Amino acid sequence: MKKIIIILILFINSVFTQKILIPMDQTQNDHLKAYGIAYYALNRNINVEWLLNFQGGSFLIDNHSFIQAECKIRGVTFLEIGNDLLDIYSTIEQNNMDIVILEKAPKIAIYSPPNKQPWDDAVTLALTYAEVEYQILWDEEVLDNTLENYDWLHLHHEDFTGQYGKFYRNYHNAPWYIEQKNSFESLAKKYGMKSVHEEKKAISRIIKNYISNGGFLFAMCSATDSYDIALSLENVDGVHSVFDGTPIDNDIVNKIDYSKSLAFKNFTIYTDPMIYEFSDIDYPPSHNPITRGAEADYFSLFEFSAKYDPVPTMLTQNHVPIIKGFMGQTTGFNKNMIKSHVIIMGEDPASDQAKYLHGNFGKGTYTFYGGHDPEDYQHFVGDPPTDLSLHRNSPGYRLILNNILFPAARKKEKKT
């Protein structure tokens, strides 16, 4: 009998040494590349346990030598776990924590134009630095119905209203602006559409259908509000004649259909081409910014019930609860214009600004994140891209990477 017990103990110990813990608290050397390790494991059909609210949202992975080697190469902190595994599970069970099983590496697409633009894209930077695979799509691929091949779609500094980013006032004579305008017009004509705004609104509806069928959308900066505006206008001409050669619909105010937008309601559209702003959704407004400066601008994350609200809990995993603010063409969202079903996950508690939103539509979801680059407070046209090796523990960039793992989560019944 004693021999059996000893064998059993040895067996249990051997099982319990077959896990690697990737801590995501302040002890982690490179938070951003840690997400890449999780994706690396999923790509090799190895499940990952995401320990929600445990040490900043840590990862638990089977202890394979090649994963250890990859962690060392990428500079990711990891620990081999033995008998402590039971203590970890017990801690999770007794606190506002939970375990989500990640099962399959999501197929990721980034919506980005083929011609180089004079600004960076935070998500492309994050995925590249974290060594996560992605494909770049543009309008042709969307119009040719290839979105269904991807689990997750990202939109960044794009303009779905057909106003070329509302850069007319300062850049309409710039070579990059003229090239972009000509390219967009040629593409619209190729697909039999009379204007760029008509073509962009068609794109927005296809993306909405993609979400409805189970897709995951993540949008930042101007791709958030301009997208919802495009959905709400549909067949209405809401752009100035300098953009399409035709006048704005005289009854545009009464023709906005807020029921067609995803997240926002009761907003006012700014049609003046000289105003660098789409609507009053943006807070603070880009054309009249009221900022406290980089040293004083912060937003806070809400804490959700890990066992009852796993989705917003996943999307807000971090090693700090308060994050540096950052600006963009769309810096944040006016709380008064957010639909009631939308979950606010991050906000400036001292103002009407929401920074980070999540909602469901059909079988899928969307997440909106205000601002352009979490580690560049005011990212201007022509600025060099951010070097993420200098910001490898960025809390703001972590929110982006939470979103790429979200589609990999095993669905489980919601507790009641």
At which residue positions do the language-model features occur?
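Helical hinge/lid and interdomain linker segments adjacent to catalytic or ligand-binding clefts
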Residues: 19-20, 25-29, 60, 64-69, ...
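Extracellular/periplasmic catalytic domains that process cell-envelope and extracellular macromolecules
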Residues: 101-104, 145-148, 210-212, 337, ...
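Extracellular ligand-binding/catalytic regions of CAZymes and related secreted enzymes
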Residues: 18-60, 335-416
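Hydrophobic targeting/anchoring helices
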Residues: 17-121, 371
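Alpha-helical scaffolding within the catalytic cores
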Residues: 91-96, 140-142, 351-355
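Sec-dependent N-terminal signal peptides
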Residues: 3-13
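A glycine-rich, often tryptophan-bearing local segment used as a flexible ligand/cofactor-contacting loop or short
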Residues: 166-303
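Catalytic beta-strand/loop cores that center a nucleophilic Ser/Cys/Thr
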Residues: 118-121, 128, 225, 255-379
